[in-house]
């Protein structure tokens, strides 16, 4: 049982003595020993709060109008004497400001849920990140490429046409399409005069030494006035008059072009489809033992022999059509014969886009640095695998045909950054930062659907945090807008002594960014693409994907491998 002890003044006076707390003057206890209780000795005192009626909340209110109506209805209940609805009223203005803020917050909440999934994402940046998690490279488009042939004057013989030099931040030579200015060389000051015409800009992709002797080269026919280079030809002979072609070497590119109609001899009747670019694999200078280098007496056995150059090119550059080499009457000079087709040097590869230099905003210390470029669209350059597997813009040792093509999924934006001035460290773009160390000066280019381009930097773990002033050097020009027609280019900027600039073939390779619906369709299935080779059929399938292979087969080596390395070598040989 529970006993109670209470302090009193006297038995007949129950109040507590003076100086004692009345609540603490009594205590209850029991005489049980060693019997612990599972309950707390504190006596609970619960005071149930008064329940107020819950307000009616319309959870369907998600925009400005509904939030404004909801708050005005609530104020009609809490302030029944207030009936003002004039927009100039202070209370109404406060309600509308809160409705605007609620509308923005609601949008952010909806956007966070929407962008969280590939099937519902609307921003292109979100689609790109979701696709990256599925190992699917989202296509951001690619700029076009074109072969450009230049004719130079004798005063500019041996001049250098510079290409890009990224370490020195030097862009390629600027080429422009036709304008009201005369074709050929123009200055940088002339660009301001034609700015309103918005000419399409290209830039050279490599250095080129210009020679006047390469403007037009006659193909040698060994005395035959009616002959042609057959379809599929990979060799020809050039007339090396006065040894003017001594600068021609393997690796140079030549254009074979029909300049007159084979039947009429008129230049207007030349077939523009009979133009083809090849890259020389060998050049051999020799002479014709039967003919002399004397136009008045070519059969003179005592005169100096006619100098020629025998050239060859890759099978991949084989002529796709028969090239007529007949000699026909010249319309301008009666009795004088001119060749139907000629070869031209001074050929350079160029791609779509003009270089822009822009100072980026200052790097802040409080929030994530994510600047955006003021001009668009950013150029995306295709790349190919070189001889050693390293990715590059084009292979200067491969066939000329391959220079206009690039590998899928290997495009990189044409942009780089300089930190703290033109001589500071360089920042380079990467497809993502997952493989970047915390010291790597790399960044990711993210483009929205409207063409705006943002730059995303590392967080100190995956990629270095940016610091200092950043200078952006990038190119604008992308997509099918660069697929200009043949003979559209007409100007070269900053190079004197050039009388003619043109692209004999239409530019190609420009493609638009991949549509969002296509990303949603293909990205979830990207893992089904086979990228391994284990069985004989796998190796044959990989070999069939090469453009140079017509049909492939693979067999397993009969001899057992002596080591794993030997097994790999045999398998590689079987694949080849």
Feature annotation, model-predicted:
Residues 1-576:
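Signature of Asx- and small-polar-rich beta-strand/turn repeats characteristic
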């Amino acid at each position: 049982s529970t006993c109670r002890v209470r302090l009193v003044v006297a038995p007949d006076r129950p109040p507590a003595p003076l100086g004692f707390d009345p609540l603490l003057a009594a205590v209850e206890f029991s005489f049980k020993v060693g019997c612990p209780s599972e309950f707390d000795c504190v006596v609970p005192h619960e005071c149930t709060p008064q329940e107020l009626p819950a307000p009616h909340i319309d959870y369907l209110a998600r925009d400005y109008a509904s939030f404004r109506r909801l708050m005005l209805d609530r104020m009609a209940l809490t302030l029944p004497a207030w009936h003002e609805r004039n927009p100039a009223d202070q209370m109404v203005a406060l309600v509308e400001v809160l409705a605007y803020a609620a509308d923005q917050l609601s949008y952010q909440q909806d956007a966070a849920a929407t962008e969280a999934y590939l099937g519902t994402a609307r921003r292109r940046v979100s689609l790109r990140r979701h696709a990256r998690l599925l190992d699917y490279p989202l296509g951001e488009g690619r700029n076009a490429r074109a072969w450009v042939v230049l004719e130079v004057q004798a005063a500019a013989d041996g001049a250098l046409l510079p290409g890009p030099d990224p370490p020195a931040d030097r862009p390629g030579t600027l080429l422009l399409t036709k304008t009201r200015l005369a074709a050929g060389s123009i200055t940088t000051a002339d660009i301001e005069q034609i700015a309103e015409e918005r000419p399409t800009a290209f830039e050279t992709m490599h250095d080129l030494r210009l020679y006047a002797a390469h403007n037009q080269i006659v193909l040698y026919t060994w005395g035959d006035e009616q002959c042609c280079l057959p379809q599929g030809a990979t060799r020809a002979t050039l007339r090396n008059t006065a040894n003017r072609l001594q600068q021609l070497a393997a690796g140079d590119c030549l254009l074979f072009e029909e300049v007159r109609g084979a039947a009429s001899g008129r230049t207007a009747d030349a077939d523009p489809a009979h133009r083809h670019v090849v890259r020389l694999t060998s050049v051999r200078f020799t002479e014709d033992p039967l003919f002399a280098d004397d136009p008045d007496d070519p059969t003179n056995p005592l005169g100096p022999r006619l100098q020629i150059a025998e050239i060859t090119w890759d099978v991949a550059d084989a002529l796709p059509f028969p090239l007529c080499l007949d000699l026909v009457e010249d319309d301008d000079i009666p009795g004088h014969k001119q060749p139907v087709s000629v070869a031209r040097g001074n050929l350079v590869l160029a791609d779509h886009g003009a270089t822009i230099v822009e100072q980026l905003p200052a790097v802040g210390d409080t929030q994530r640095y994510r600047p955006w470029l003021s001009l668009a669209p950013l150029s995306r350059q295709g790349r190919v695998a070189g001889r050693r597997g390293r990715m590059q813009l084009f292979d200067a040792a491969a066939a000329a045909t391959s220079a206009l093509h690039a590998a899928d999924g290997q495009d990189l934006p044409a942009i780089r950054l300089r930190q703290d001035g033109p001589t500071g460290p360089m920042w380079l773009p990467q497809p993502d930062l997952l493989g970047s160390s915390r010291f790597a000066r790399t960044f990711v280019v993210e483009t929205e659907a409207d063409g705006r381009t943002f730059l995303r930097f590392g967080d100190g773990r995956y990629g270095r945090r940016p610091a200092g002033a950043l200078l952006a050097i990038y190119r604008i020009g992308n997509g099918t807008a660069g697929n200009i027609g043949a003979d559209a280019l007409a100007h070269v900027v900053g190079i004197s002594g050039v009388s003619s600039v043109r692209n004999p073939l239409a530019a190609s390779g420009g493609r638009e960014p991949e549509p969002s619906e296509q990303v949603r369709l293909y990205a979830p299935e990207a893992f089904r693409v086979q990228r391994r080779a284990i069985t004989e059929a796998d190796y044959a399938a990989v070999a069939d994907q090469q453009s140079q292979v017509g049909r492939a087969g693979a067999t397993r080596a009969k001899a057992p491998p002596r080591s794993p390395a030997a097994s790999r070598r045999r398998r590689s040989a079987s694949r080849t």
